[in-house]
Structures are given as C-alpha cells and as structure tokens.
C-alpha cells in the first residue's frame, strides 16, 4: 500500500498531518495519493517517460511511482489499496470453478493465460481478478489437490463446498494396497500397472540343474543357481541350517528323484570353506607325488644328456664326456658330486670325501694329498671380494657344518679365480 511518503500537491484537499519529502513535494501521512496524480503517473509512463523522470516532474517519491506502476501493470487498476482491514477475497467459488475448468481443458495453460481469459470472458474485472501468484496458489491447493483414497479402496474424495477437484487423466489409477499387499510399493504398484499371473515374480525361486549321469557315476554335481528377487536371509548358505530347510521346501519331489535330492543334501551340508588340516594333508600328498623317484628320473636324464653333450675347458682331461652318473634317491643324493661344482662337505661325524674325488675336480698341482677342507666364508674379510660370483652361489660356502682350517695354498688358489 502506498500510504507512506506520498507526495500530494493538493494537500489542501486532505487536511491532516503532512510534510515535505526530499523532492519538495507535499504529502499527507496515512492518506493515499490523489487519483489525479495517479492518472498523471500512468499517462507519463505510457508516453515513455522513465519512472525517475516522473518522480522529479511530479515531485513524488520514486518508491511511490514504482509501486503505482507495478500495480497498474499487474492488475490494470490505479486505485489505491484498502486502508485498514483485509482486501476482499477474489478467489470466490465461481472463480475457482472457472480456473478448474480452464485447467481441465488445457492442463498446460499458464497462470497469466488463465488471468487474461478471466478478464476476456468477463468473469472478473480489473479490480477483482486474482493475481498470477493467487492463480498458481489456487491451482496448487484446490484444483490439483492430492488424491487420498479411503481405506476401503473406494477412492471417493470429499471436497469442501464450492471447490472442484480435477481428476488427473494423465496418470492411471493406482491399485489399492488391499488388492496387492506385496507389490504395492514396487514399481508396478506405484505406477498402477496390472500384473498377470504369468508375469508375477516368484520370491525365493531357485532353479537347480543336475546331470543324472554325473550323479550315478560319482562325478561332480553341477548346480546353476538363478535367484529372482531373493530377500535377505533366504539365500542358501552351507553354514546355515535355515537356508537348507527353506531351500528344501521349494524343491518339489516330482521334479527331482530321490537320488538327486540326497545328492543335493550332501552338497548343502558340506561347509563352504575347506578345512585347514584337510588342505595341508592334500598339499603334502601332492608334494610327495611330485618329488617321487618316477617324477625326478626324466629331469635327471635331461641333465645327464646336457652334461655329456657339452665340454668344459676348465675341467681338462680329468673329466670325460661319456661319464654316467647313477640315479640316487633320498639322502644319498646329498653325497652325489656333479662336475663343475665344489663338493659338499658333510657335517662332522658323517664322513669325508676321498682324495680321488677331489683330484678329479681340480688339478692336483694346486692341492696337497690331504683331504680337502675349507673354512667358513666369514673367515675372509668380505664375501664380495671374489671376482667370480658363481663361487658365492655354491652350496659349499653356505653349509652349516663346522670345518677345519684350510692350507694357505688352497685359499690362494680360490683367490686367483
């Protein structure tokens, strides 16, 4: 309402407490602007004069001019608002019914189009036509009122007198919860799509495909699970007895034979995770079969053939190319000496190698006739000072058995490599 800061050039027409605004215009407190000034403001606006220029010419505050022009553009009226009390209600039952009728005929009609049509058909005039916001509120609260079905599923709504509810034709009716208690909150239940008996989803449905030939022959049982809409707790679990019982209830006797049902029971009673002790025993049995004598024989034959085919110039004539090595098993393999590698000295108390064995490995001019022995590799300053890394990888230097001191000539011979 424009009751404050109103410039009134004709203040004599409105006796009362008045004043002068910042533009020099005279106004009266609590009284609206005269209709003559209001009409002049609208005329200047139609002529294209800016609101700020209108305010200076008529010496009316800019806020007053903007409010009068805004109301005129919205309602087409230049009359002031009612002083005191509330303005008369424009959303009469007749107007609400017309708005509902327009919305029913054209659901996509905008509020400003409804307002123009109310004015064009003479339902309302410029003073009683509802605003755009009022029309939107009427459509939201009264015309498109949410549909609340009764508990008995009749779907009849009770409306206030004078108000009309527009039935929505765009969406199909939603089936009540009493007709479909399970699927009322599903997608089909929300959208109201009817479901036939053939398309009805089966809960806890399990399809088990078995091969009778494998069952009779003792082979593995092939199971293919197809779970459709399985709720929590109904999944078959090998550790849960309830899962076995619930699954057994769904398996019909006319579908599977007694032998197949017993095979299924054995599968379900078996734990889901293998036993630790059974797994270790299984691994030990596999390792025993892998390193048995029949399994090692082909590999040793390949080593013998490769050694016999190649010649090593470092060995000289002491090692012949046609030597054969017997196949040994168990602990005897530890005493077997292969050409090109230093011999393995057994621990104390297990015997030593004869001199002839050492003489066949290295030229005899570098060693004495005594049995060969060598100290631990820690007796030297650093192990990496050997130029030949093959010596460091030999099992001889990493043996845990204690050894006696070696002659200085033997150490010097290995240092020259």
Curated annotation (Swiss-Prot):
The keyword Protein biosynthesis does not apply. This is Paired box protein Pax-2. The lineage of its organism: Eukaryota, Metazoa, Chordata, Craniata, Vertebrata. Interacts with ELGN3; the interaction targets PAX2 for destruction. Interacts with TLE4. Residues 94-142 are annotated as: RED subdomain. It comes from Homo sapiens. The modification Phosphothreonine is found at residue 226. Residues 19-75 are annotated as: PAI subdomain. It is found in: Nucleus. GO terms for biological process: axonogenesis; brain morphogenesis; branching involved in ureteric bud morphogenesis; camera-type eye development; cell fate determination; cellular response to glucose stimulus; cellular response to retinoic acid; cochlea development. Changing residue 24 to E: Found in a patient with non-syndromic renal hypodysplasia; likely pathogenic. Its main location: nucleus. Keywords: Developmental protein, Differentiation, Disease variant, DNA-binding, Nucleus, Paired box, Phosphoprotein, Transcription, Transcription regulation. One of its GO terms (cellular component) is centriolar satellite. Residues 305-325 have a biased composition (Polar residues). Coiled coil: none annotated. SMART domains: PAX. The gene is PAX2. Residues 304-325 are annotated as: Disordered. Transcription factor that may have a role in kidney cell differentiation. Has a critical role in the development of the urogenital tract, the eyes, and the CNS. InterPro entries: Homeodomain-like_sf (IPR009057), PAIRED_DNA-bd_dom (IPR043182), Paired_dom (IPR001523), Pax2_C (IPR022130), PAX_fam (IPR043565), WH-like_DNA-bd_sf (IPR036388).
């Amino acid at each position: 309402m424009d009751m404050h800061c109103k410039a009134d050039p004709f203040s004599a027409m409105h006796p009362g407490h008045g004043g002068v605004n910042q533009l020099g215009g005279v106004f009266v407190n609590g009284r609206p602007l005269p209709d003559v000034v209001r009409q002049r403001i609208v005329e200047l606006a139609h002529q294209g004069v800016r609101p700020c220029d209108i305010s200076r010419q008529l010496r009316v505050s800019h806020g007053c001019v903007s409010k009068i022009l805004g109301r005129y553009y919205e309602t087409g009226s230049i009359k002031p608002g009612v002083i005191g009390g509330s303005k008369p209600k424009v959303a009469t039952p007749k107007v609400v019914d017309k708005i509902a009728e327009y919305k029913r005929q054209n659901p996509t009609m905008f509020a400003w189009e409804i307002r123009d049509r109310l004015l064009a058909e003479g339902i309302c005039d410029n003073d009683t036509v509802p605003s755009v916001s009022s029309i939107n509120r009427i459509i939201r609260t009264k015309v498109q009122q949410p549909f609340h079905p009764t508990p008995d599923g009749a779907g009849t709504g009770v409306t206030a007198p004078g108000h009309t509810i527009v039935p929505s034709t765009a969406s199909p009716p939603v089936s009540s919860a009493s007709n479909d208690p399970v699927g009322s909150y599903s997608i089909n239940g929300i959208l109201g799509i009817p479901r036939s008996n053939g398309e009805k989803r089966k809960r806890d449905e399990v399809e088990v495909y078995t091969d009778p030939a494998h069952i009779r022959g003792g082979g593995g049982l092939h199971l293919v699970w197809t779970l459709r809409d399985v709720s929590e707790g109904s999944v078959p679990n090998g550790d849960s007895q309830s899962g076995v019982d619930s699954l057994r209830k769904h398996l019909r006797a006319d579908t599977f034979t007694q032998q197949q049902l017993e095979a299924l029971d054995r599968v379900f009673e078996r734990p889901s995770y293998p036993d630790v002790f059974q797994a270790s025993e299984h691994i030990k049995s596999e390792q025993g079969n892998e390193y048995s004598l029949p399994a090692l024989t082909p590999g040793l034959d390949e080593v013998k053939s490769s050694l016999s085919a190649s010649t090593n110039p470092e060995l000289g004539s002491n090692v012949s190319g046609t030597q054969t090595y017997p196949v040994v098993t168990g602990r005897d393999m530890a005493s077997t000496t292969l050409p090109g590698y230093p011999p393995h000295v057994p621990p104390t108390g297990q015997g030593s190698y004869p001199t002839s064995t050492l003489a066949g490995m290295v030229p005899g001019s570098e060693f004495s006739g005594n049995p060969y022995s060598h100290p631990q590799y820690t007796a030297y300053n650093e192990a990496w000072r050997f130029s030949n890394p093959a010596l460091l990888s030999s099992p001889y230097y990493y043996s845990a058995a204690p050894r006696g001191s070696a002659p200085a000539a033997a150490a010097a011979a290995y240092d020259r490599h």
